[in-house]
From Swiss-Prot:
Record gene name: rimK
Binding site for Mg(2+) 1: D248, E260
GO biological process, one term: SOS response
Positions contributing to ATP binding: K141, E178, F179, D187, R211, S212, N213
Native source species: Maridesulfovibrio salexigens (strain ATCC 14822 / DSM 2638 / NCIMB 8403 / VKM B-1763)
Name of this chain's protein: Probable alpha-L-glutamate ligase
Positions with a binding annotation for Mn(2+) 1: D248, E260
Co-factor remark: Binds 2 magnesium or manganese ions per subunit.
Length: 301
């Protein structure tokens, strides 16, 4: 097979791991920087060019689209879909998962456990937002934040109101969420491939930090997940329409609650923590499922 990996950085652990898994199985693999692609958008012969060369003959694409390039990266993925190339994660699913508010609304509609979340346009409803999530302490999140950035724990009501008004003064979109204190600064990252949880780890925030992201200095250990947590992760991936993703779950007093569904999860932390060949299992999944034109949206975006 000829497999393309859309990634801006060939040297990243995740990209390297996928390249090695492709090579080990005898596939032709190419790392493509999506920002260096440009497109001929035409009705009968859509194409993608890369430094003057047409990108042709690909059997599958693995999108590794960073949050900062979601718009252009998804346009490139969509173009591959229009050309009939199988994409592990479709453009519409990536876009859906990157919108925190839209994700929560879709998950809520299907009955997935979530932290109580409030959202408003105007600061005149700040007190109501705080009441909706049960008062302080509470969590305030920038909708555009990633890797734990733009996430603040407000310990008191006055602090919460000040932070909300400060963010709104910058015209930032924010979510206000209940603080799950019983999680004690930890979460569960479940990696889902093709509707199955293939690996999971517990991430613990560093001392004094409620954020468990490894990018923020957290640590990781192996964990045995419950059947309910497994079901929650699988259902969340399906609702988002993602063939490959990381589902972040908190253990609350009322069962598992989903914090995020990540369409481009890092492989380093979970592969090193669990000794599971995640990249290899993803390539195995592609081998079984890659067919020309096999997109749920049929390239319609």
């Amino acid at each position: 097979m000829k497999i393309g990996i859309l990634s801006r950085k060939r040297e990243l652990y995740s990209t390297n791991s996928l390249v090695e898994a492709c090579n080990a199985r005898g596939h032709e693999v190419r790392v493509i920087n999506p920002l260096r692609c440009y497109m001929n958008i035409t009705s009968h012969n859509p194409s993608i060019l890369y430094k003057g060369e047409k990108l042709e003959g690909f059997d599958a694409i693995i999108p590794r689209i960073g949050a900062s390039i979601t718009f252009y990266g998804c346009a490139v993925v969509r173009q591959f879909e229009m050309m009939g190339v199988y994409c592990v994660n479709e453009s519409v699913a990536i876009t859906r998962s990157r919108d925190k508010l839209r994700s929560l609304q879709l998950l809520a509609r299907k009955g997935i456990g979530l932290p109580v979340t409030a959202f408003a346009h105007s600061t005149q409803y700040t007190e109501d937002l705080i009441d909706i999530v049960g008062g302080a302490p509470l969590v305030i999140k920038l909708l555009e934040g990633t890797q734990g950035k733009g996430v603040v724990l407000a310990e008191t009501r006055n602090t919460a109101a000040s932070i909300i008004e400060a963010f709104k003064g910058l015209e930032a979109n924010i979510l206000v969420q209940e603080f799950i204190s019983e999680a004690s600064g930890s979460d569960i990252r479940c990696l889902v491939v093709g509707g199955k949880v293939i690996a999971s780890m517990k991430r613990q925030g560093r001392e004094g930090d409620f954020r468990s992201n490894l990018h923020q200095g957290g640590s990781a250990t192996q964990v045995r997940i419950t059947p309910e947590e497994r079901s929650t992760a699988v259902r969340s991936a399906k609702i988002m329409g993602l063939g490959f993703c990381g589902v972040d779950i908190l253990r609350s007093n009322h069962g598992p609650v989903v914090m995020e569904v990540n369409s481009s999860p890092g492989l380093e932390g979970i592969e090193k923590t669990t000794d599971i060949d995640v990249a290899g299992q993803l390539i195995d999944y592609i081998e079984k499922n890659a067919q020309p034109g096999k997109t749920k949206t049929k390239g319609k975006g």
